[in-house]
Regions:
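Low-complexity, highly charged intrinsically disordered N-terminal segments
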Residues: 11, 22-60, 64-65
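Short beta-strand elements
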Residues: 131, 135, 216-220, 243-247, ...
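FAD-binding subdomain of flavoenzyme oxidoreductases
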Residues: 139-302
Length: 431
């Protein structure tokens, strides 16, 4: 076939999916703007006409988060809730004025950060105003190398924050590069404000802590005025307002500014490791000893049960490497073995010693080293699962994850109970 014929064939093959891949125009004729024109004009005076939108596309773009339910509704063109107007504030002062105005006139107000919410917290169920923080509300307010802190507007994205910190010598005249240390799976499409108000945890939280450990101070625009928490890391009095505000998901006000701890970025000191254990019990005991041995913490610390291990080894092509015959030879059986991987960060000596102690404990519990190959494979795709979910939906498959906090003493029982329930569901694959 000619090149033109092949192109036409490709286009034709997409016709069956043309109503399901988002290329068709957005039409919200069933959801007209309900907010009175005088309110929209007043909002234009606050943020400027260029930062106000009532177009169908912009209204729909902030109406949903990223749960499977949200994505399925969008794919089926089911629109339950949209805001009447979308605002793109530039300054904290503008946000404070918007909050005051919406409070005075009883107008519902919602906030949209990176859009990766899985709690339906961004859905404007009562219409009104949606503040889209992505376009303009994403600037650095201050950088303090002595205190090792940075203050940013709440709409700054994870990648932009990390790029800024790693460019600190060029941008701020800093002596070295820095990192925030917070890398949730939603990193590429989430904001600093979103991390804070959802009290998130990242993939490197074993070493750097969750966002509750990283945030030092917050500023909110509320119906009763501005709330600014203390800039100190610890206080002798309580309750701790900083901790109360984190996790509030916008119920107390609009988060405008966040001060974060930052850490020295030393990727050259990173030590990657991966081990395979013969059983889930041995893997759990090894992991617990690693965390309780008082010899430091790795940055990434991931343990997979037999089912997830089976999938991950295939994804990382381990079954096509010389490692597979070795696993079979030494009795690491499929659907019994468990994968453990991670890496250490920090000062050179610290990073090296943590990795050494992890190796010592892993070998004690029968772990077999798999080199850093598996960990590097995981790193390459650490933020890819959401993309995989969307692709699988094209084939009628819906994927999702479960999260919970456990103690070491009830970890095995919770794991067994959750697996039992999931396996009992029809047409369900558990990994």
């Amino acid at each position: 076939r000619s090149r033109r014929q092949r192109q036409m064939c490709i286009r034709d093959s997409f016709k069956a999916y043309s109503d399901d891949i988002g290329f068709d125009p957005v039409d919200l004729s069933d959801h007209p703007v309900q907010l009175a024109p005088e309110h929209i004009e007043a909002l234009k005076k606050i943020v400027g006409e260029q930062n106000v939108s009532t177009t169908d596309y912009d209204r729909l773009s902030v109406a949903y988060g990223f749960t499977a339910y949200d994505i399925l509704r969008l794919r089926h063109k089911r629109v339950d809730s949209v805001p009447d107007v979308v605002l793109y504030p530039e300054t904290t002062g503008q946000v404070e004025q918007i909050v005051a105005y919406s409070t005075e006139h009883h107008i519902p107000l919602y906030v949209y950060g990176g859009g990766s919410s899985v709690t339906r917290g961004v859905e404007p169920v009562k219409g009104g105003i949606s503040l889209d923080m992505r376009r303009n509300f994403n600037k650095v307010i201050s950088f303090n190398e002595i205190d090792q802190t940075i203050t940013v507007q709440a709409g700054m994205s994870g990648p932009d924050l990390e790029k800024t910190l790693q460019s600190a010598p060029e941008l701020f005249g800093a002596k070295r590069q820095y990192t925030c240390g917070h890398f949730p799976q939603s990193f590429e499409y989430s904001s600093v404000g979103g991390w804070t108000v959802t009290r998130g945890a990242g993939q490197n939280s074993t070493y750097y802590g969750t966002i509750a450990d990283i945030v030092l101070s917050q500023k909110y625009a509320t119906p009763i005025g501005t709330i600014q928490t203390s800039h100190y890391s610890r206080e002798a009095t309580g309750p701790n307002l900083n901790q109360i505000m984190m996790g509030s998901e916008g119920t107390f006000g609009v988060l405008t500014e966040v001060t974060l701890r930052i850490f020295r970025w030393m990727p050259q000191n990173r030590k990657r490791f991966s081990y395979i254990f013969k059983t889930w019990d041995a893997a759990m005991k090894a992991a617990r000893e690693m965390m309780q041995c008082e010899c430091g913490y790795s940055s990434v610390f991931r343990l997979s049960d037999p089912e997830e291990t089976n999938l991950m080894l295939k994804l990382y092509n381990v079954d096509e490497t010389p490692l597979q015959p070795l696993l079979d030879k030494f009795g690491y059986k499929d659907m019994e073995r468990c994968l453990f991987l991670g890496f250490t960060d920090g000062e050179k000596g610290y990073s090296r010693n943590v990795a050494r102690n992890i190796a010592k404990i892993a070998l004690k519990h029968g772990g077999m080293p798999l080199t850093g190959y598996v960990t590097r494979s995981w790193e390459k795709g650490r933020f890819n699962d959401p993309y995989l979910r969307d692709t699988l939906m094209d084939f009628g498959i819906t994927t999702d994850t479960l999260e919970c906090t456990v103690n070491w003493s009830n970890m095995e029982q919770v794991h067994a109970d959750v697996r039992k329930i999931c396996h009992a569901l029809p047409n369900t694959v558990v990994t």
